[in-house]
Amino acid sequence: MNVPVEKNSSFSKELQQTLRSRHLLRTELSFSDEMIEWHIKNGYITAENSISINKRRYRCNRCGQTDQRYFSFYHSSGKNKLYCRSCVMMGRVSEEVPLYSWKEENESNWKSIKLTWDGKLSSGQQKAANVLIEAISKKEELLIWAVCGAGKTEMLFPGIESALNQGLRVCIATPRTDVVLELAPRLKAAFQGADISALYGGSDDKGRLSPLMISTTHQLLRYKDAIDVMIIDEVDAFPYSADQTLQFAVQKARKKNSTLVYLSATPPKELKRKALNGQLHSVRIPARHHRKPLPEPRFVWCGNWKKKLNRNKIPPAVKRWIEFHVKEGRPVFLFVPSVSILEKAAACFKGVHCRTASVHAEDKHRKEKVQQFRDGQLDLLITTTILERGVTVPKVQTGVLGAESSIFTESALVQIAGRTGRHKEYADGDVIYFHFGKTKSMLDARKHIKEMNELAAKVECTD
């Protein structure tokens, strides 16, 4: 329903709430043309060209796309009109359609917020929390480089509490919807009574502006100059690491004078280089919250595993390893390089006496299968790299079939190894890279984990 403008009125608070710190198309605004024009004329709203054209070079002002291959034309009202294909899934941006924003500075008006989490941080977590609070006060960039299972979410809590009570808006941005769904209930439990929104495609909160936001990086395309403290979780994860439009979305959604925090167990080389050279403020947490060393991966040669799978056979070394752990009541993750190999492996395991399922990115029942695995209803879960992050299962043992495959980068292998040993009661466990020839990525991943364990022992972060 279009909301009309009242004669002789001041600005519309409803329109202000809709547009403040946002970057929206006309189709996303349920207000009359008269109202919008009045607010533009009186200086409350800016209407910015959606696409900038300079010497026949195009730039999308919503997603920042400048690659000319992403621009095309559609026919409307007898004309060919330019539009951006890069962000079209969020509503079509074209040369004749403006992006609207509210011009006034967004002032916070929420009540003081108290952390309701009653856990205790480890010394390493507390160190990171203190550095984060300092970075927020100084509006700095910060890298929190913490191993898988270090309790990265919990170490953010004191900094989030401090920021919210200064009237600063905080956003945790992550490349994956799965992570938003996992983090949202934890943050709502830790900050009971706070207004928290979870933003992802299809969410009820989509487009909301709240003091604490957990968002996919895609959803940030709808915001502009909104965030005081931007925390990028899994900065090295796909698709954020490979998509410049998502990196642009983060920068556009931040206020000009704001804090930017990178959170990762496996930071990209450029961030790592800057941190080690002192060009980027950083804090390194080399141990898990339970103070036990990271399980170090072992390499196990399994021959021509592809040939065996094509003959509907499981490599004997892999089969023996899985059967041993299943017999002992320990669940097993088996990572494979592709969906086609996953399907072959799943078919082969039908003849093995264990409760088995397989998952990949397009699996409609992925969420249910992962929950069954967590609940102990499955013995073996075969998966692609879609589950390399964010899944915690007690007592789980982790194997990689075809660890020499190019999909298994150093970062991916470190993340996969991080599935094992996350619980205090089950802090050790097996991590096996089954291979048909070692690769540099395999060696680098093992070296990475060994170095973290050595550093943790040196600074007395492990028992």
UniProtKB/Swiss-Prot annotation:
<protein>
    <recommendedName>
        <fullName>Competence protein ComFA</fullName>
        <ecNumber>3.6.4.-</ecNumber>
    </recommendedName>
</protein>
<dbReference type="InterPro" id="IPR001650">
    <property type="entry name" value="Helicase_C-like"/>
</dbReference>
<dbReference type="GO" id="GO:0016887">
    <property type="term" value="F:ATP hydrolysis activity"/>
</dbReference>
<dbReference type="Pfam" id="PF00271">
    <property type="entry name" value="Helicase_C"/>
</dbReference>
<dbReference type="GO" id="GO:0006260">
    <property type="term" value="P:DNA replication"/>
</dbReference>
<dbReference type="InterPro" id="IPR050880">
    <property type="entry name" value="PriA_helicase"/>
</dbReference>
<dbReference type="GO" id="GO:0006270">
    <property type="term" value="P:DNA replication initiation"/>
</dbReference>
<keyword id="KW-0238">DNA-binding</keyword>
<comment type="similarity">
    <text>Belongs to the DEAD box helicase family.</text>
</comment>
<feature type="binding site">
    <location>
        <position position="60"/>
    </location>
    <ligand>
        <name>Zn(2+)</name>
    </ligand>
</feature>
<feature type="binding site">
    <location>
        <begin position="146"/>
        <end position="153"/>
    </location>
    <ligand>
        <name>ATP</name>
    </ligand>
</feature>
<dbReference type="GO" id="GO:0005524">
    <property type="term" value="F:ATP binding"/>
</dbReference>
<feature type="domain" description="Helicase ATP-binding">
    <location>
        <begin position="133"/>
        <end position="285"/>
    </location>
</feature>
<feature type="binding site">
    <location>
        <position position="63"/>
    </location>
    <ligand>
        <name>Zn(2+)</name>
    </ligand>
</feature>
<comment type="subunit">
    <text>Monomer and dimer in solution. Interacts with DprA and ComFC; ComFA-ComFC form rings about 150 Angstroms in diameter with apparent 6-fold symmetry.</text>
</comment>
<dbReference type="GO" id="GO:0030420">
    <property type="term" value="P:establishment of competence for transformation"/>
</dbReference>
<dbReference type="GO" id="GO:0006302">
    <property type="term" value="P:double-strand break repair"/>
</dbReference>
<dbReference type="GO" id="GO:0005737">
    <property type="term" value="C:cytoplasm"/>
</dbReference>
<keyword id="KW-0963">Cytoplasm</keyword>
<dbReference type="InterPro" id="IPR014001">
    <property type="entry name" value="Helicase_ATP-bd"/>
</dbReference>
<keyword id="KW-0378">Hydrolase</keyword>
<dbReference type="GO" id="GO:0006310">
    <property type="term" value="P:DNA recombination"/>
</dbReference>
<feature type="binding site">
    <location>
        <position position="87"/>
    </location>
    <ligand>
        <name>Zn(2+)</name>
    </ligand>
</feature>
<feature type="short sequence motif" description="DEAD box">
    <location>
        <begin position="233"/>
        <end position="236"/>
    </location>
</feature>
<keyword id="KW-0178">Competence</keyword>
<keyword id="KW-0862">Zinc</keyword>
<keyword id="KW-0067">ATP-binding</keyword>
<keyword id="KW-0547">Nucleotide-binding</keyword>
<feature type="binding site">
    <location>
        <position position="84"/>
    </location>
    <ligand>
        <name>Zn(2+)</name>
    </ligand>
</feature>
<comment type="function">
    <text>Involved in transformation (genetic competence for DNA uptake). Required for DNA uptake but not for DNA binding to cells. DNA uptake is energy dependent, this protein may provide the driving force for DNA uptake. Does not have helicase activity, translocates on single-stranded (ss)DNA in a 5'-3' direction in an ATP-dependent manner, but does not unwind double-stranded (ds)DNA. ATP hydrolysis causes the release of ssDNA from ComFA. A ssDNA-stimulated ATPase; dsDNA does not stimulate ATPase. ATP hydrolysis causes the release of ssDNA from ComFA.</text>
</comment>
<keyword id="KW-0479">Metal-binding</keyword>
<dbReference type="InterPro" id="IPR027417">
    <property type="entry name" value="P-loop_NTPase"/>
</dbReference>
<dbReference type="GO" id="GO:0003676">
    <property type="term" value="F:nucleic acid binding"/>
</dbReference>
<dbReference type="GO" id="GO:0043138">
    <property type="term" value="F:3'-5' DNA helicase activity"/>
</dbReference>
<feature type="domain" description="Helicase C-terminal">
    <location>
        <begin position="317"/>
        <end position="463"/>
    </location>
</feature>
<dbReference type="InterPro" id="IPR011545">
    <property type="entry name" value="DEAD/DEAH_box_helicase_dom"/>
</dbReference>
<dbReference type="Pfam" id="PF00270">
    <property type="entry name" value="DEAD"/>
</dbReference>
